[in-house]
Amino acid sequence: MRKLLFLCSFLWIGTSLFAQDRVKWDFSYNTSTKEIQLKAIISEGWHLYSQHINNTIGPVPTSFTFTENPNIKFEGEVMEPKAIHEYDENFEAALDFFKSEVTFTRKVAKAKSGEVIKGYVTFMVCNEVMCLPPVDVDFSITIP
């Protein structure tokens, strides 16, 4: 029984790491627009779900969680470009998602040079055959 539990744990960890390989993240700060940019580069054949899908349907929407910092103020929520809207046979529903790459942005209203914006992104990827379990990826963005 312990061996089976260990094997299941190993497989779960392995598939989570595999999901991270399907999406490469780049986190940066744009000084001219004063916004953070959270860019996902998605492997061919895979797609990343929008923040704005109904999570009761099945797939986990992409979400961003920010660590509290009294020296940093945001203006509004995380924005995303227009997503692909298609019927998904696996979930038997029309869903919004991104292929290839997508850049999410959030306007920074107040932050001093040297401040660090920290948090994590939670996301899930699928292809035509399968979905990988949701993954959290930490980020840290220094204001120049």
PLM feature spans:
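Extracellular/lumen-exposed scaffold segments
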Residues: 20-144
